Amino acid sequence: AQPPEYDLAFVLRADERIMWPLEAKVLETPGAVAAYAHDVENEFLKCRYAPFSSSGAMVAYLISGAATDALSSIATRLGCELHEVVGHSARPNRYSKHTRCVPPGKTYPSSFDCYHLVLEYPGLTRSRVSTR
């Protein structure tokens, strides 16, 4: 089995096993959250990402649409409430609370908070690569 590869992780110097990972996904539209939700459910909540940490983060790069709509779609797809981050409610970020499926024999934290940040890129046009 290959170790997980996060997009970005902050590592605790005292114990390199402990890291706070961030996973990033491009969202073409606010409703295109399947891959985003897949990483939350299958990487973070199954302890593949951040097994020794009680939190992690997802970053969404939204190509078109509103961040508030993307956050709403994420909440619906994950089947949970997204809470405002105290002191930062005007920003397009929220967090969700989960109970993880900890593998038998492991002492990983079962309670997990996932932070969600949506960055809007209005008017961005993505280039398409020709396969000719």
Please tell me what each predicted stretch does.
Residues 4, 45-47:
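Alpha-helical scaffolding within the catalytic cores
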Residues 8-10, 20-28, 44:
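Conserved catalytic cores of phosphodiester-cleaving nucleases, focusing on short active-site segments
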Residues 1-16:
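Active-site metal-binding core of divalent-cation-utilizing nuclease and nuclease-like domains
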Residues 30-34, 47-55, 68-132:
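C-terminal tail/extension regions appended to the core domain(s) of diverse proteins
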Residues 37-43:
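Well-ordered, non-membrane alpha-helical segments in soluble/globular domains
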Residues 60-66:
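Short beta-alpha junction loops
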Residues 1-2, 33-37:
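Phosphate/oxyanion-binding active-site loops and adjacent basic polyanion-contact surfaces
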